[in-house]
UniProtKB/Swiss-Prot annotation:
A cellular component annotation (GO) from this entry: cytoplasm
Name of the featured protein: GTPase Obg
Obg domain location: 2-160
Gene: obg
Subcellular localization: Cytoplasm
Length: 437
């Protein structure tokens, strides 16, 4: 049996774009041969793709770093470098992807074949053929490739099941799943026999089918992490119907009604929306002594909490071991599923905007100026830094082009307003140059 893993942290890095090339044609009567350097190729993106054959995130336990290949450099004769292929990473259905730094949900992957770009590849740098003008017919300018996006991600698997079984340990959830489906969960006469979620397909006598999940037993304080706690509570979030299994034999000395109230409090504390899901009470172990008496007492206690009799939850007395009452329970569950819509885990406000990593937002601040301890002026800002990394510092014309870009952004004027004088050191990252007023 493969190990079950439902959380993982990974780092992804898209490929860098290939550098543009400075090259010239070797033809008579063409100044300097004419520009002939091609563009660099696009860097590969990192893409998550849903594979319905996967059931766990175990593949990410030892392989946590994923890096796509960079694009090829531009070539002579105006030929572009080859773009790199995207890196496709398979994930199971029900995988939620978060940005580890911001905690923002990037996507919720639930459909087989669904894809999402988690790190976008960098654009290839332009070759010098792109910079030819009537005033400069033979430019010695080419751009470096754009860096690929790099991210730290948190993956969380919430299994896809129509029906979730909840209840205290040893109330018979695993036994119930084993007799109504082909699932083979571990069953034992001790607490927390089930330590991972088990999923089984159920088929009713009328031909309806649905997926049922047996979740590890809950105890008081589970929503705060007591016992197996929130480690597996997440898996009930995708279910549409909850089967609340209760041991009506009270064989372990617990009160069935107190168990019912305690579990519902844990569900509500973990996620208020869990209580919006329709719930069927499964009174299990009815073949045991005193179970009928306990059930009658349970019904009376439950009814006392409701003013409207029609709002009372449905109760189905069963015995998983004796195979009693199962058909009617499954038929009622199928009927309830048929009239219950899916519950949306994340709305548009929860999901991070899917925007190009290097796209300039209208409100994006172009640059910032600060003063270092050594009195150097330090320039920073996403837009400015992107322009810098794409500047080929080995070419004088490229450096001059970058200087013009800084001037156009208002950097020179801003430095003067801050008090910069001729000869002052200006720093971008580790690169330094003198301010010329």
């Amino acid at each position: 049996m493969s190990m079950f893993l439902d959380t993982a942290k990974v780092s992804v890095q898209a490929g860098r774009g290939g550098d543009g090339m400075v090259a010239f044609r070797r033809e008579k009567y063409v100044p300097n041969g004419g520009p002939w350097g091609g563009d660099g190729g696009k860097g590969g993106s990192v893409i998550f793709k849903v594979d319905e054959g996967l059931r766990t995130l175990i593949d990410f336990r030892y392989n946590r770093k994923f890096k796509a290949k960079s694009g090829e450099k531009g070539m002579t004769k105006g030929m572009h470098g080859r773009g790199s292929e995207d890196l496709i990473i398979s994930v199971p259905q029900g995988t939620t992807v978060r940005d580890a730094e911001t905690g923002k949900v990037l996507t919720d992957l639930v459909e087989h074949g669904q894809e999402f770009v988690v790190a976008k590849g960098g654009r290839g740098g332009r070759g010098n053929i792109r910079f030819a003008t009537p005033r400069n017919p033979a430019p010695e300018i080419a751009e470096n490739g754009e860096p690929g996006e790099e991210r730290q991600l948190e993956l969380e698997l919430k299994i896809l099941a129509d029906v979730g079984l909840v209840g205290f340990p040893s109330v018979g959830k695993s036994t119930l799943l084993s007799v109504v489906s082909s699932a083979k969960p571990k069953i034992g006469a001790y607490h927390f026999t089930t330590i991972v979620p088990n999923l089984g397909m159920v088929r009713t006598k009328s031909g309806e089918s649905f997926a049922m999940a047996d979740l590890p037993g809950l105890i008081k304080g589970a929503s705060q992490g007591v016992g197996l706690g929130t480690q597996f509570l997440r898996h009930i979030e995708r279910t549409r119907v909850i089967l609340h299994v209760i041991d009506m034999s009270a064989a372990e000395g617990r009160d069935p009604y107190e168990d019912y109230v305690a579990i519902n409090k844990e569900l509500e504390a973990y996620n208020l929306r869990l209580m919006e899901r329709p719930q069927i009470i499964v009174a299990n172990k009815m073949d045991m002594p005193e179970a009928k008496e306990q059930l009658q007492r349970f019904k009376e206690q439950l009814a006392a909490q409701y003013d409207d009799f029609e709002e009372l939850p449905i109760i189905f007395p069963i015995s998983s071991l004796a195979h009693q009452g199962l058909d009617s329970l499954l038929e009622a569950t199928a009927e309830l599923l048929a009239k219950t819509d899916d519950f949306l885990l994340y709305d548009e406000a929860d999901l991070a905007e899917d925007e190009a990593y290097y796209g300039f937002a209208a409100e994006e601040k172009a640059f910032e100026i600060s003063r270092a301890d050594d009195a150097a002026w330090v320039l920073s800002g996403e837009k400015l830094e992107r322009l810098f990394v794409m500047t080929n510092l080995e070419r004088d014309e490229s450096i001059m082009k970058f200087a013009r870009q800084l001037r156009g952004m208002g950097v020179d004027e801003a430095l003067r307003e801050r008090g910069a004088k001729d000869g002052d050191i200006v720093r971008i990252g580790k690169f330094e140059f003198e301010f010329v007023d």
